[in-house]
Amino acid sequence: MSKQFESVQATLEKYIPAEELSEVKRILYGYNRGHHVKSLPICQEALDLANKNNFEIVASKVEADPEQLRKPRIVRLGIIQNSIGAETTAPIQDQYLAIEAKIEKMIDAAGAMGVNVLCLQETWHMPFAFCTREKYPWVEFAESASTGQSIKFIQRMARKYNMVIISPMLERDDVHASTIHNTAVVVGNNGNIIGKSRKNHIPRTGDFNESTYYMESTLGHPVFETIYGKIAINICYGRHHNLNWLAYGLNGAEIVFNPSATVGELSEPMWGVEARNAAMTNNYFVGSINRVGTEHFPNEFTSGNGKPAHKDFGHFYGSSYFSSPDNCCTPSLSRVSDGLNISEVDLNLCQQVKDKWNFQMTARYELYAKFLTDYINPNYQPNIIKDPSMK
């Protein structure tokens, strides 16, 4: 593809004078404790890995106010966005190994930076081939969530760096008739499997033909308690559903990752808004991850919109970033490059923002519980009061 637009942030910094830029960034990206989000120094080992292996690193720091009784709960979070590593016509195993080789170097950089919790993008170990509606060869990427090769690789890296790693994958559930699921496996810092979450909302729009392969999760909204904090995974399309975000928060999540695969024409104006809103209204940190690059497939497919058949999904625009409970957000990765985004956060900020805004105290859950109970009744009638003067 020809030269792509790198990022909104890079363009602002290139063309807006420094004084005005400071105010623009305050309004667009928010303040943390009265100032712009601070940068975090990147160690030389991580920089060398990035330069040698052609990926970018950004790092930031989100602080909480000091407290008298609670010590700071400092955790380093990492998110990785990546393109595929081989042509989609290559043998399946070659495609997987090419991606694994990329990811290993980026996890090495995360380890050098002392990342505690790392999340990869949606189905990181394969092309996002669900646009094709073809079952084979793409379902051959599906594997066991406990013994698959991608999980064994992630377990090895988790042990190596004492790191909790979330591995979003295409799961083959051998226990239940070999059904396929869009799953995120949570691997503990000892390399143990803590549990798994699945995609709650499956898109049926444009080229997102995912229900051809898997259906909605029945696991609910699990939150995983780790030595570094309470973690949840809201996979991709679930970010468009406010109640999905809410449920993870009510279950106690402090960090919610949103591993995604989404393209510019469909969702890019929404990308910088949804996760920040969720972080603020639910009082937790959010790591938003999107794959990057344009993936071309061997056979043409259509989008159901009357336009010509094509062989690519469109451009996955990356732009992975973190959102904070206080509604600031960190610098994002670019729209065009593989990358690692790191943010050092103080989890005490979650409670501090709850105490400030009182969203949970003022939420009126009973009001909405009754409304939703009424709404799902087949005989529900909307409460619409009509102007009597209307004819």
Curated annotation (Swiss-Prot):
Enzyme class: hydrolase
Family under the similarity heading: Belongs to the carbon-nitrogen hydrolase superfamily. BUP family.
Superkingdom, natural source: Eukaryota
InterPro entries registered for this protein in UniProt: Aliph_Amidase/BUP (IPR050345), C-N_Hydrolase (IPR003010), C-N_Hydrolase_sf (IPR036526)
GO molecular function (one): beta-ureidopropionase activity
Protein's pathway: Amino-acid biosynthesis; beta-alanine biosynthesis
Gene3D superfamilies for the chain: Carbon-nitrogen hydrolase
Lineage summary: Eukaryota, Amoebozoa, Evosea, Eumycetozoa, Dictyostelia
SUPFAM superfamilies per the UniProt record, alphabetical: Carbon-nitrogen hydrolase (SSF56317)
Quaternary structure, from the entry: Homodimer and higher homooligomers.
Reactions listed under catalytic activity: 3-(carbamoylamino)propanoate + H2O + 2 H(+) = beta-alanine + NH4(+) + CO2; 3-(carbamoylamino)-2-methylpropanoate + H2O + 2 H(+) = (R)-3-amino-2-methylpropanoate + NH4(+) + CO2
Xref: PANTHER family: BETA-UREIDOPROPIONASE, NITRILASE C965.09-RELATED
Sites of N-acetylserine modification: S2
GO biological process, one term: beta-alanine biosynthetic process via 3-ureidopropionate
Sorted UniProt keywords: Acetylation, Hydrolase
Free-text function comment from the UniProt entry: Catalyzes a late step in pyrimidine degradation. Converts N-carbamoyl-beta-alanine (3-ureidopropanoate) into beta-alanine, ammonia and carbon dioxide. Likewise, converts N-carbamoyl-beta-aminoisobutyrate (3-ureidoisobutyrate) into beta-aminoisobutyrate, ammonia and carbon dioxide.
EC number: 3.5.1.6
Sequence ranges assigned to domain CN hydrolase in this UniProt record: 75-347
Catalytic residues, chain numbering: E122, K199, C236
Name of the featured protein: Beta-ureidopropionase
Gene: pyd3
GO cellular component: phagocytic vesicle
